[in-house]
Amino acid sequence: MSDSETEETTKQSTEPVDNAWSLKIPTFKAEDNPHGMVEESSFATLFPKYREKYLKEVWPLVQQTVAEHHLRAELDLIEGSMVVKTTRKTWDPYIIIKSRDMIKLMARSVPFEQAKRVLQDETGCDIIKIGNLVHKKEKFVKRRQRLIGPNGATLKSIELLTDCYVLVQGNTVAALGPYKGLQQVRDIVLETMNNVHPIYNIKALMIKRELMKDPQLANEDWSRFLPKFKNKNISKRKQPKSRKPKGEYTPFPPAQPESKIDKQLASGEYFLNKEQKQAKRQQERVAKQAEAAKKQDERRNKDFMPPTEDSPEQNRKRPSEASKVDVKALKAKLLKANKQK
């Protein structure tokens, strides 16, 4: 390659790009790293007990898949761990990271047929932790179910729009697919856990997909076409803290409150002996019980008390004020009517 061609290639690679997603990542080949890896690298991850049976069945396929990339995989059923290691023939330095992501996905209940896709260059994965985003357990379960939807319809629509495989499992959401789709999945999941229904983001993705097809709207602002979410939960205004009015300033400290002994000295109870104190308490208790019994009897006898009747004088019909006739006003009205005739 001549110097002019090298300069032209460098110039093209440093120019600003309108759409970074359209750029193609250059492939890494075995010729680029002929000497292989200097030292062995390994990654291990634990898996739950219920995944042991499935992993034991598919492990020969896992070993066969990683062997194509010159890696070695080990399954330890006693410790409950999966390990991937590089070999002397490994030439791709990033494939060990990809294989680590694969065993992480398999530990989180992603099937092997989907997890092995992460070994491809244009495919990545994202494990979104949602367990600590909502404090109350009931709200967390409700919002997580909202993400799945009835019969998994919402989750399926997210997968179709983002070209990603999405699995909701426990306190995490595992996503697998192209990097742009992973970014969209993370936004939808986080907003859903923040009490924004996923249907708003799904509608926005559908509208964006249609707008991309129109070349006239390629360089315009799309915000006027997208749905706007309005929060209907109006937060209550924080009430101002009520402050007690300060009293007049005095240089003297406040009076000491009376203690229990001071109250007993004032009432004379302090000088009584033990028997007298017990007798006084018993007397107060009896008086209190007698008062409570009296109130209870009054409440019971209330239903048997005869109602009060009005006296005969009160029952007489009194002429109402409305029945009185104003004679003067009536005469004036008649005279006015005669004059008009």
Curated annotation (Swiss-Prot):
- Basic and acidic residues biased stretches: 272-303, 313-327
Q: Which residues form a coiled coil?
A: 271-341
Q: What does this protein do?
A: Required for 40S ribosome biogenesis. Involved in nucleolar processing of pre-18S ribosomal RNA and ribosome assembly. Binds to RNA. Required for female germline development, cell viability during eye development and for survival of dividing cells and epithelial cells during early wing disk development.
Q: Which CDD domains match?
A: KH-I_KRR1_rpt1, KH-I_KRR1_rpt2
Name the residue ranges with Basic residues bias: 230-244
**Which residues does the annotated region (Disordered) include?**
230-327
Domain called KH: residue spans: 126-194
For this protein's source organism, the top of the classification is:
Eukaryota, Metazoa, Ecdysozoa, Arthropoda, Hexapoda
Give disulfide pairs as residue numbers. none
Q: Which Gene3D superfamilies match?
A: K Homology domain, type 1 (3.30.1370.10)
Q: Give an example GO biological process.
A: rRNA processing
Name of the protein in question: KRR1 small subunit processome component homolog
What GO molecular function annotations does the UniProt record carry, in alphabetical order? RNA binding
UniProt-listed InterPro entries: KH_dom, KH_dom_type_1_sf, KRR1-like_KH1, KRR1-like_KH1_euk, KRR1-like_KH2, KRR1-like_KH2_euk, rRNA_assembly_KRR1
The UniProt keywords, alphabetically, are:
Coiled coil, Developmental protein, Nucleus, Ribonucleoprotein, Ribosome biogenesis, RNA-binding, rRNA processing
Q: Where does the UniProt annotation locate this protein? A: Nucleus, Nucleolus
One cellular component term from this protein's GO annotations in UniProt: nucleoplasm
SUPFAM superfamilies reported for this sequence: Eukaryotic type KH-domain (KH-domain type I) (SSF54791)
- Gene behind this protein: dbe
Q: Which family does it belong to?
A: Belongs to the KRR1 family.
Q: What is its main location?
A: nucleus
Oligomeric state and interaction partners are given as: Monomer. Component of the ribosomal small subunit (SSU) processome.
